[in-house]
Amino acid sequence: APGSYLYYDGRNAPYNRLTGLHGGFAVMPQGSSNRVYSGSPTFVQQYFWVFNECDPAWNNAVRNRQTPSGRYTPRYFTINGLSGRPPGAPGAMDPAIDSMADPRTKLDGHLGDRTLIRCLNAGLAKHSVHTHGNHMEWLTSNGQVRPAVWEKDIVPLDGNGGGADVIYPFDPVPDAWPPMTNTTLRQAENEGRHSAYPMHLH
């Protein structure tokens, strides 16, 4: 069936999955390259955001070929295997370690570049996926087509294999002054003023 899927190593569950033996793949509707499911809103580009987290005590136990016995307490959170770095911190904007600079993760587009984000959760923790600068169109939840497409700025992502498909529309903010257009964004960049859609997770 068309949709977004998490693949993972099911042996030694959930430890192998939590330590990185996972990924995402897409099944496109037959005859379509710009829809999540037949009749869905369209998109022009797509990304996978595969979420995970790390409990150092659990990872250390698995590394030593032991079964973790303590309570699961994640301390580090990742998208596509990378963590985020605050501006100015060591590694900030290094695409090898900072998810906000990684071209597989960082949303990049112009006004109207409707972008599908396939959110999948390999970890156990629940997340609230939140972007700034736009609402997202929430299409699916845990592999099920939602009865109506909602515009949301926060989309829940269940733990332990949860998923959500959303479209980030790259629409201009309606009350922005001066009004945002591709022309005004290009002019700002020509003047040395970088314009970007900020994003972080909660």
Where are these regions (language model features)?
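Copper-binding active sites and cupredoxin-like electron-transfer domains
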Residues: 1-202
